[in-house]
Regions:
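Extracellular "complement/coagulation-type" protease architecture
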Residues: 2-479
């Protein structure tokens, strides 16, 4: 992790609020309140929708303006009236702004996640875009497959348990359900594409428990810059070591699987039993960490530098590792969530990259895990001639600052770039990127480049299913 300087956050102000006609689902009706904010900010630095009071926030349209960022949220006429009354009663601009922001952040959005697993009753719910409502899923002979795919779709990787429960007459979100066409169910495909509305005569619905992920027992310091990480603050981070020497980072995604980068496994690093995974420590020394053995390494067979060393294309730089024994999770060892199906990285979104990489380009590895917070840069900017001149493909994204100074570096490869979001009313971290490549470290207009994990969800899923009992080094093409 290369760090030249610390970039501090700027103060945000809320100068005005304006109303317009708009509805992201029905453009012929409804209203919105658009809260436009102005703030001093670093290039490419943005703001994301967050939750307040645990509500799920989705598709709060963010558009950059000349003075700041516009945060859009949907209101019905009744809600608008309620907010207006609230604003008048509060009588102070500061209190009024607080009310609008609170209401915006509590409004549940349904564009990003089509599937919900309710943590209160464990019922599976799928969004019906035609009726603009959530439906429970009627029990069927496809319950186990559907439950497993559902967990994957929301980024939870694996199913822990599923069951069937009865709902009373008039239950099931107004008595409406989805039934499933079993022949259309498939890993890597959204389950809503196999659903149709039904009455569910059995009155039995599917409930399930997915592997928990993306949660931390210990918070990290909210500092923008490269700093020593706290023990337990990034519990999915691992050190991949070959013959006892740190080579790359990786991310725990389940009790048996690690995600890393394909380029970590060049020809001279392909004797699988010489690899070890160090977990649960901010130090990259075995004496301070749990050590796991590797059974299988699967890398993407279309990672072109492995096909021809003269090819300068780092697309599909991804690999997964299977462990010989399942991990026991604790406060220092936890899996990170994968992106949900259809989830996209957002230009300007802040993320965190962690690793033990070089603290200088020609320097030495860090002894303590480093963390740095950097914004995602748009593909358009990153492909500009003075950046990477069209080398950024759809399977990558860039993150960093125009002036450089903070970046991943040698030794960080394969490690996580995570972003925080809220799903099912719980704040979680998702593995948005894998440290892949870059020109130098922390150079101006040469940000870090990351494998875009959302593009490889079907590949990861297939690799875990097909190679869980296949020891050795394996390669698998796209699915």
């Amino acid at each position: 992790m290369y760090v030249e300087k610390v970039v501090t956050g700027k103060k945000m102000v809320f100068p005005h609020c304006k109303a317009q006609l708009y509805d992201p689902r029905n453009r012929n009706s409804s209203t919105i309140v658009m809260l436009t904010t102005s703030m001093e900010r670093n290039p490419y630095r943005g703001m994301r929708g967050r939750t307040r009071g645990g509500a799920n926030v989705r598709n709060k349209e963010l558009s950059k303006g000349s003075n700041g960022i516009s945060l859009t949220c949907v209101f019905t006429p009744c809600r608008v009236m309620g907010v207006c009354v609230t604003l008048m009663m509060m009588g102070a601009v500061g209190a009024a702004v607080w009310a609008v922001v609170t209401y915006c952040t509590m409004e549940e959005d349904t564009e990003l996640y089509d599937v919900q697993v309710n943590f209160a009753d464990q019922h599976l719910r799928v969004f019906d875009p035609a009726q603009k409502r959530w439906r429970q899923v009627c029990s069927s002979s496809a319950n186990q497959l559907l439950a497993s795919i559902s967990c994957e779709e929301v980024g939870f990787v694996s199913l822990v348990n599923y069951s069937v429960t009865s709902v009373p007459e008039g239950g099931g979100d107004g008595g409406e359900f989805f039934c499933v066409r079993q022949e259309e169910l498939s890993y890597g495909k959204k389950i809503k594409d196999s659903m149709y509305p039904c009455d569910c005569e059995s009155r039995e619905v599917l409930t399930l428990v997915c592997q928990d992920c993306g949660r931390r027992s210990f918070a990290a310091d909210r500092i923008v810059g490269g700093v020593d990480a706290r023990q337990g603050s990034w519990p999915w981070q691992v050190s991949l070591q070959y013959d006892g020497v740190h080579q790359c980072g990786g991310s725990i995604i389940s009790d048996r699987w690690i995600v890393s980068a394909a380029h970590c496994f060049r020809d001279r690093f392909r004797i699988v039993n010489r690899w070890r995974v160090l977990l649960g420590s901010i130090y990259n020394k075995p004496v301070n960490a749990n050590v796991a053995e590797v059974k299988t390494i699967v890398y993407h067979s279309s990672y072109l530098p492995f096909v021809n060393a003269d090819i300068d294309d780092n697309s599909r730089d991804i690999a997964v590792l299977a462990l010989t024994q399942p991990l026991t999770f604790n406060e220092y060892i936890q899996p990170v969530c994968l992106p949900a199906y259809g989830q996209r990285v957002i230009d300007g979104q802040m993320g965190t990259v962690t690793g033990w990489g070089n603290v200088e380009y020609y320097g030495h590895l860090a002894n303590v895990l480093q963390e740095a917070h950097v914004p995602i840069i748009s593909d358009t900017v990153c492909n500009a001639p003075d950046y990477y001149d069209n080398q950024i493909t759809t399977s990558m994204f860039c993150a960093g600052y125009e002036k450089g100074g903070i970046d991943a570096c040698q030794g960080d490869s394969g490690g996580p770039f995570v972003g925080e979001d809220s799903f099912s009313k719980t704040s979680r971290y998702r593995l948005l990127g894998v440290v892949s490549w870059g020109t130098g470290c922390a150079m101006p207009k040469k940000p870090g480049v990351y494998t875009r994990v959302s593009r490889f969800l079907p590949w990861i899923s297939t690799a875990m299913r097909n190679y869980q009992n296949s020891p050795g080094i394996q390669k698998m093409a796209r699915t």
